[in-house]
């Protein structure tokens, strides 16, 4: 089963992705989805069983509890994930960014999910001087047309991984940073 096979599997993968690498998520999700590719199956699992599958993921104990509770909440709400911000953000372990990824990637609804990586890049590139991800999301939504938000979110992530990593960042390696820093120096009169 692929992570993007359903809104549910996408939601689970995004919930697992916090504080860990995509590589780790991609390693554990096939085993998890073999046993629990629906909220109904996840709700039937014991927290300890979920934890044993995802133990290599950061914050695994909390995520295991949240996955079970989230599945139970979905069942109590009709059994399916709906494209509804309030519903998604009411689920255990689901914040605004996770809800945004599901809204944009599973349902095609314009959203601009901002995590710490996009927040850092938007600041480096001069697209936002936001002190938090909510302000950065607001700024990016003003910079980019709404019909581009879903793909811009992904483009920023992939571009950042390739040219503008958090660690070992070299201004000369990132075309945007080299341009943005030159623009900033000109503005500051250097």
Where are these regions (language model features)?
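Catalytic cores of DNA base-excision repair glycosylases
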Residues: 4-190
